[in-house]
């Protein structure tokens, strides 16, 4: 009889790991602490809740590493990607989802699987000794008891960084006499984003307000915690230089204002639900106090009467030093019955977290069945990400990382004709090589 595998955490990684195990006919108990114990950032008790953005980023599998990871996960039977595709909303070349529909779809699939049992309870601390195989996917908002247990097992201090959340506004509160629909360079449908224009004077006033606005205070023990560079609060970016945002998330390139002159800067809003009634401010994650957010963001042309469905916020993320404490199949070296998955391993992003959950589920299933399982090739997105988390990164300076082509072994610099391959052609070469390597690996795990 196959032993039950316990998965702790019903976020993206835990949900994906549980699905992969169940699809391999392994009995799974999925433990989710919400609603028994809540977190500072979650709004619901749904499985696979998207806490920050509703975007899974670029879906371009030829020229973007995260788009390639999407493709590989689809080919590997990912539940998260299947539900993202089922609940996607317009977002240009990105894969964005209706967050409620997505979460409900994941939860329904897991609850309806005959090999999965969902328990709403907190696993406080070290899992019981008679749990022979455990996947810990407690996420960036790991409870204090579990964080302390991990610290004790690894012999290391918990590492942490701050992550911020962007506000969401109702579409019908936006003034379309000033704002307009358009994607940069008319990608996607050509009108997947709402754009709010600012001239130079308005932009300068906005930047000054961001810098001087009242921020959330840190606890004493949080003050030395760094931010994740890929999700900086907008006011932190503003403090780095007056025009930092004008060359970053507020750059006006690829857009034409039908309501007036060419803007100096643009605030973009991306659809947040399937109904198209909610839009989030792209790149506007913030630690401003709620009253300040309403005041400052309503100074943006087109958002003067904005109704906020959710204001931004800040939460502290916890992760372990994967290269130091994990083996090559995501097991804790100190306790091999425990396998880690998701953002707690130090990968960063929804897609990356789900991908590590997928691999943890596959590794755990193979172990439960007494089979050896090959790791995905290093030339694939799955393999490159796994290698980063489990050993290729420098342990002394290990930090959360999104998937990128810099994690892959470099392809040949010249093609078969001896011509140097660079730019977009080089990115496509990464993707072609990954596809070729993934097929035989998928065949081995399906045998």
From Swiss-Prot:
Where does the protein end up? Answer: Cytoplasm
Query: What does the entry give for GO biological process?
Result: tRNA methylation; tRNA wobble uridine modification
The protein's predominant localisation is: cytoplasm
Positions of FAD binding: 9-14
- EC annotation from Swiss-Prot or TrEMBL: 2.1.1.74
Q: Which HAMAP family match?
A: TrmFO
Q: What keywords sit in the KW lines? A: Cytoplasm, FAD, Flavoprotein, Methyltransferase, NAD, NADP, Transferase, tRNA processing
Which cofactors, by name?
FAD
**What protein family does this chain belong to?**
Belongs to the MnmG family. TrmFO subfamily.
Q: Which organism is it from?
A: Paramagnetospirillum magneticum (strain ATCC 700264 / AMB-1) (Magnetospirillum magneticum)
> Which reaction is this enzyme known to catalyze?
uridine(54) in tRNA + (6R)-5,10-methylene-5,6,7,8-tetrahydrofolate + NADH + H(+) = 5-methyluridine(54) in tRNA + (6S)-5,6,7,8-tetrahydrofolate + NAD(+); uridine(54) in tRNA + (6R)-5,10-methylene-5,6,7,8-tetrahydrofolate + NADPH + H(+) = 5-methyluridine(54) in tRNA + (6S)-5,6,7,8-tetrahydrofolate + NADP(+)
What's one GO-annotated cellular component? cytosol
Q: Which Pfam families match?
A: GIDA
Q: What job does the chain carry out?
A: Catalyzes the folate-dependent formation of 5-methyl-uridine at position 54 (M-5-U54) in all tRNAs.
Coiled-coil annotation: which residues? none
| Gene that this sequence comes from | trmFO
Provide the GO MF annotations for this entry: flavin adenine dinucleotide binding; tRNA (uracil(54)-C5)-methyltransferase activity, 5,10-methylenetetrahydrofolate-dependent
Protein name, per record: Methylenetetrahydrofolate--tRNA-(uracil-5-)-methyltransferase TrmFO
SS bond partners: none
Its EC top class is transferase
């Amino acid at each position: 009889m196959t032993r039950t595998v316990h998965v702790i955490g019903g976020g993206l990684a835990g949900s994906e790991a549980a699905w992969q195990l169940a699809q391999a006919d392994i009995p799974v108990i999925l433990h989710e602490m919400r609603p028994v114990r809540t977190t500072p950032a979650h709004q619901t008790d749904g499985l696979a809740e998207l806490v920050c953005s509703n975007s899974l980023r670029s879906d371009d599998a030829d020229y973007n590493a995260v788009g390639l990871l999407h493709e590989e996960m689809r080919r590997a039977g990912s539940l998260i990607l299947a539900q993202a595709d089922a609940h996607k909303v317009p977002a240009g070349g990105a894969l964005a989802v209706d967050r409620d529909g997505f979460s409900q779809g994941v939860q329904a699939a897991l609850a309806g699987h005959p090999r999965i049992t969902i328990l709403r309870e907190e696993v406080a601390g070290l899992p019981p000794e008679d749990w022979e195989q455990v996947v810990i996917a407690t996420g960036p908002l790991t409870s204090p008891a579990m964080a302390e247990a991990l610290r004790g097992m690894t012999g290391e201090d918990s590492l942490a960084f701050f992550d911020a959340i962007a506000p969401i506004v109702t579409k019908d509160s936006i003034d379309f006499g000033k704002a307009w629909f358009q994607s940069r360079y008319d990608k996607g449908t050509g009108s997947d984003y709402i754009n709010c224009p600012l001239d130079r004077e308005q932009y300068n006033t906005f930047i000054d307000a961001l810098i001087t606005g009242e921020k959330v205070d840190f606890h004493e023990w949080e003050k030395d915690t760094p931010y994740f560079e890929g999700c900086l609060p907008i006011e932190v970016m503003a403090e780095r230089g007056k025009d930092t945002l004008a060359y970053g998330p507020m750059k006006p390139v690829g857009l034409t204002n039908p309501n007036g002159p060419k803007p100096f800067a643009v605030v973009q809003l991306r659809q947040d639900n399937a109904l198209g009634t909610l839009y989030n401010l792209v790149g506007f994650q913030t630690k401003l106090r709620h009253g300040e957010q309403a005041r400052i963001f309503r100074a943006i042309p087109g958002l003067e009467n904005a109704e906020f469905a959710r204001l931004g916020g800040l939460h502290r993320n916890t992760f372990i030093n994967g290269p130091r404490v994990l083996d090559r199949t995501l097991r804790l070296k100190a306790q091999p019955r425990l396998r880690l998955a998701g953002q707690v391993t130090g990968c960063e992003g929804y897609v990356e977290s789900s991908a590590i959950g997928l691999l943890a589920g596959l590794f755990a299933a193979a172990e439960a069945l007494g089979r050896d399982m090959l790791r995905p090739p290093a030339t694939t997105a799955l393999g490159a990400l796994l290698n980063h988390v489990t050993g290729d990164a420098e342990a002394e300076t290990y930090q959360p990382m999104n998937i990128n082509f810099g994690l892959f072994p470099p392809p040949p610099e010249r093609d078969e004709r001896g011509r140097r391959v660079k730019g977009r052609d080089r990115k496509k070469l990464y993707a072609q090589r990954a596809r070729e390597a993934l097929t035989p690996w998928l065949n081995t795990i399906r045998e």
